[in-house]
Protein backbone atom coordinates (compact mmCIF):
# COMPACT_ATOMS: atom_id res chain seq x y z
CA UNK A 1 0.00 0.00 0.00
CA UNK A 2 1.51 3.32 -1.11
CA UNK A 3 -0.58 6.30 0.00
CA UNK A 4 -3.77 4.32 -0.51
CA UNK A 5 -2.76 2.72 -3.80
CA UNK A 6 -2.13 -1.01 -3.88
CA UNK A 7 1.09 -1.83 -5.73
CA UNK A 8 2.19 -5.32 -6.69
CA UNK A 9 5.62 -6.29 -8.02
CA UNK A 10 7.29 -9.26 -9.69
CA UNK A 11 11.05 -9.06 -10.15
CA UNK A 12 13.67 -11.16 -11.90
CA UNK A 13 17.36 -10.32 -11.50
CA UNK A 14 19.99 -11.85 -13.77
CA UNK A 15 23.72 -11.36 -14.33
CA UNK A 16 25.59 -12.37 -17.46
CA UNK A 17 28.99 -13.97 -16.87
CA UNK A 18 31.68 -11.29 -17.09
CA UNK A 19 29.28 -8.35 -16.80
CA UNK A 20 29.48 -5.72 -14.09
CA UNK A 21 25.77 -4.93 -14.38
CA UNK A 22 22.80 -7.07 -13.33
CA UNK A 23 19.57 -6.93 -15.34
CA UNK A 24 16.44 -6.10 -13.35
CA UNK A 25 13.15 -7.06 -15.05
CA UNK A 26 10.10 -5.85 -13.16
CA UNK A 27 6.35 -6.13 -13.65
CA UNK A 28 4.41 -3.57 -11.60
CA UNK A 29 0.74 -2.92 -11.12
CA UNK A 30 -0.53 0.30 -9.53
CA UNK A 31 2.01 2.76 -10.96
CA UNK A 32 3.44 3.78 -14.32
CA UNK A 33 6.97 4.75 -13.21
CA UNK A 34 9.60 3.46 -10.81
CA UNK A 35 12.75 4.96 -9.36
CA UNK A 36 15.99 2.99 -9.16
CA UNK A 37 18.84 4.49 -7.19
CA UNK A 38 22.49 4.53 -6.32
CA UNK A 39 23.46 5.05 -2.67
CA UNK A 40 26.01 7.86 -2.35
CA UNK A 41 27.31 6.49 0.98
CA UNK A 42 29.42 9.27 2.54
CA UNK A 43 28.95 11.81 -0.30
CA UNK A 44 32.69 11.83 -1.06
CA UNK A 45 32.40 10.77 -4.69
CA UNK A 46 31.49 12.29 -8.04
CA UNK A 47 28.21 11.76 -9.84
CA UNK A 48 27.89 11.40 -13.61
CA UNK A 49 24.71 11.78 -15.63
CA UNK A 50 24.24 11.00 -19.32
CA UNK A 51 20.57 11.33 -20.21
CA UNK A 52 21.23 10.75 -23.92
CA UNK A 53 22.72 7.31 -23.24
CA UNK A 54 20.38 6.64 -20.30
CA UNK A 55 22.81 6.18 -17.42
CA UNK A 56 23.70 7.53 -13.99
CA UNK A 57 27.00 6.88 -12.23
CA UNK A 58 28.80 7.48 -8.99
CA UNK A 59 32.59 7.14 -8.59
CA UNK A 60 33.65 7.09 -4.96
CA UNK A 61 36.56 6.32 -2.65
CA UNK A 62 36.12 3.00 -0.85
CA UNK A 63 38.58 2.03 1.90
CA UNK A 64 41.97 1.91 0.14
CA UNK A 65 40.49 1.86 -3.39
CA UNK A 66 37.63 3.30 -5.45
CA UNK A 67 34.26 2.03 -6.75
CA UNK A 68 32.10 2.95 -9.71
CA UNK A 69 28.35 2.44 -9.31
CA UNK A 70 25.96 2.69 -12.23
CA UNK A 71 22.45 2.35 -13.57
CA UNK A 72 21.79 1.97 -17.31
CA UNK A 73 18.24 2.37 -18.57
CA UNK A 74 17.25 1.18 -22.06
CA UNK A 75 16.63 3.85 -24.67
CA UNK A 76 13.77 6.29 -24.12
CA UNK A 77 12.56 4.87 -20.78
CA UNK A 78 14.48 7.15 -18.37
CA UNK A 79 12.06 10.03 -17.87
CA UNK A 80 14.20 11.94 -15.38
CA UNK A 81 16.53 11.71 -12.43
CA UNK A 82 16.84 13.09 -8.91
CA UNK A 83 19.95 13.85 -6.85
CA UNK A 84 18.84 13.58 -3.21
CA UNK A 85 21.43 14.87 -0.72
CA UNK A 86 21.47 14.69 3.07
CA UNK A 87 24.16 14.89 5.75
CA UNK A 88 23.15 11.46 7.06
CA UNK A 89 25.48 8.62 6.03
CA UNK A 90 24.08 6.17 3.44
CA UNK A 91 20.87 8.19 2.94
CA UNK A 92 21.89 10.31 -0.07
CA UNK A 93 20.92 8.86 -3.44
CA UNK A 94 20.97 9.41 -7.18
CA UNK A 95 17.68 8.14 -8.64
CA UNK A 96 16.73 7.28 -12.22
CA UNK A 97 13.00 7.67 -12.88
CA UNK A 98 11.94 4.95 -15.34
CA UNK A 99 8.73 4.66 -17.39
CA UNK A 100 6.98 1.29 -17.55
CA UNK A 101 5.93 0.03 -20.98
CA UNK A 102 2.32 -0.65 -22.01
CA UNK A 103 2.52 -4.14 -20.47
CA UNK A 104 3.45 -2.68 -17.04
CA UNK A 105 7.03 -3.93 -17.44
CA UNK A 106 10.38 -2.26 -17.07
CA UNK A 107 14.00 -3.34 -17.39
CA UNK A 108 17.19 -1.64 -16.29
CA UNK A 109 20.76 -2.60 -15.41
CA UNK A 110 22.63 -1.76 -12.22
CA UNK A 111 25.96 -2.73 -10.73
CA UNK A 112 29.49 -1.67 -9.94
CA UNK A 113 33.15 -1.84 -10.85
CA UNK A 114 36.06 -1.92 -8.41
CA UNK A 115 39.37 -0.19 -9.11
CA UNK A 116 41.33 -3.07 -7.53
CA UNK A 117 39.80 -5.52 -10.05
CA UNK A 118 42.00 -3.91 -12.69
CA UNK A 119 39.03 -3.29 -15.00
CA UNK A 120 38.56 0.41 -14.25
CA UNK A 121 41.25 2.82 -13.08
CA UNK A 122 39.17 5.99 -13.09
CA UNK A 123 35.74 7.58 -13.30
CA UNK A 124 36.43 8.19 -16.99
CA UNK A 125 37.02 4.47 -17.66
CA UNK A 126 33.93 3.49 -15.66
CA UNK A 127 31.75 5.92 -17.60
CA UNK A 128 33.23 4.70 -20.90
CA UNK A 129 32.06 1.21 -19.87
CA UNK A 130 28.55 2.55 -19.18
CA UNK A 131 28.51 4.29 -22.58
CA UNK A 132 29.58 1.11 -24.36
CA UNK A 133 27.01 -0.96 -22.44
CA UNK A 134 24.29 1.54 -23.40
CA UNK A 135 25.35 1.42 -27.06
CA UNK A 136 25.18 -2.39 -27.02
CA UNK A 137 21.60 -2.19 -25.71
CA UNK A 138 20.70 0.17 -28.57
CA UNK A 139 22.43 -2.04 -31.15
CA UNK A 140 22.04 -5.68 -30.10
CA UNK A 141 23.87 -8.46 -31.88
CA UNK A 142 21.49 -10.16 -34.30
CA UNK A 143 22.20 -13.62 -35.69
CA UNK A 144 20.51 -15.26 -38.63
CA UNK A 145 20.92 -19.00 -38.97
CA UNK A 146 20.02 -20.60 -42.28
Question: Residue ranges of each PLM-predicted region?
Answer:
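Short, well-ordered beta-strand segments enriched in hydrophobic/aromatic residues
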Residues: 11, 22-29
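Generic recognition of long tandem-repeat/solenoid scaffolds
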Residues: 1, 54-58, 96
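Polysaccharide-binding surfaces and accessory modules of carbohydrate-active proteins
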Residues: 35-86
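Solvent-exposed residues in well-ordered beta-strands and their adjoining turns
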Residues: 27-29, 39-41, 111-115
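Beta-strand-rich recognition/accessory modules
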Residues: 75-146
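Extended, loop-rich substrate-binding clefts of extracytoplasmic carbohydrate-active enzymes
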Residues: 1-17
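A short, structured loop/turn motif at beta-sheet edges
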Residues: 17, 27-33, 99-105
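Short, surface-exposed linear segments at secondary-structure transitions and domain or protein termini
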Residues: 18-24, 45-48
Amino acid sequence: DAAGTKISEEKMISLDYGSNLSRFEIILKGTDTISAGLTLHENKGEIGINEKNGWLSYWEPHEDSELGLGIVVPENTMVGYEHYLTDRKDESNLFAHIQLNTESKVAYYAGFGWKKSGQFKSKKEWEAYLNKFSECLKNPLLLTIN
